[in-house]
Amino acid sequence: MPAPYKDRFAGKKVLVTGASQGIGEATALRFAEEGAQVALNGRKEDKLIAVREKLPKVSGGEHPIATGDISKEDDVKRLVAESIKAMGGLDVLVCNAGYQIPSPSEDIKLEDFEGVMAVNVTGVMLPCREVIRYWLENGIKGTIIVNSSVHQIIPKPHYLGYSASKGAVGNIVRTLALEYATRGIRVNAVAPGAIVTPINMSWIDDPEQYKAVSSHIPMKRPGESREIADAITFLAAEDSTYITGQTLYVDGGLTLYGDFENNWSS
């Protein structure tokens, strides 16, 4: 689908974490289609290079690669600094990287729980901290969008760590939005529902589960990564300058449905 606003982000500098696939890749593509220079973060350089090859060229220069583990402080300090140096600035941060490990709650391993929290919570806090520091030092009124989940408000059986992490993300967004509103820094989240992405292949590849998931979404289908990218770019654009501290649910109406446990417990 072509970008609706070709030059909406012309001259803007964007950093997207978890940009090697799925929603992160779609988001990077949408920003670039609309004129932004995009720094691509992920752990595997070859995957990021493959994504970069899909992005249109923009006037700001090449889209830089910023490898690193967003749950590691030294990595985040480096990749944020490298991104800013390569692009000559930074206007938008998209915290997209996410991780989940299914397990009955009585069997969850501590290392698995901590691993999910490290990526989904620490991996949001650290990039936000480093980017906000840069903005405050340079008087920049930037925008942060965090990729959360409908599980920010709806429990997901067998995914205790994931549900807990997304609840934490919601409060990170609200806290930062309130703390820095007077400095012109906006912070919002998108909360995808059931989306066709690599992280959801367990049910996407199972015809029966795919049918069951789709049947319990009011719009009767899972979403596409580009639809989440549409929401993210809206929250980054001038169209949303009076919106901060909010979570935009992009879920086909999934959060309107009450019998979640019986349909998502597998």
UniProtKB/Swiss-Prot annotation:
Keyword annotations for this protein, in alphabetical order, are: NADP, Oxidoreductase
Identify the SUPFAM superfamilies for this entry: NAD(P)-binding Rossmann-fold domains (SSF51735)
The signal peptide stretch is none
Q: Which Gene3D superfamilies match?
A: NAD(P)-binding Rossmann-like Domain
Q: Name one GO molecular function term.
A: glucose 1-dehydrogenase (NADP+) activity
The EC number(s) this enzyme carries? 1.1.1.119
What's the catalysed reaction?
A: D-glucose + NADP(+) = D-glucono-1,5-lactone + NADPH + H(+)
Where would one find coiled-coil regions in this protein? none
**Active-site residues?**
162
Q: Please tell me where substrate binds in this chain.
A: 149
Chain positions recorded as NADP(+) binding sites: 15-39
Q: What does this protein do?
A: Oxidizes both D-glucose and D-mannose, but is 15 times more catalytically efficient with mannose. Strictly dependent on NADP.
Write out the similarity annotation: Belongs to the short-chain dehydrogenases/reductases (SDR) family.
Q: Which NCBIfam families match?
A: PRK07231.1
Q: How does it assemble?
A: Homotetramer or homooctamer.
Name of the protein: Glucose 1-dehydrogenase
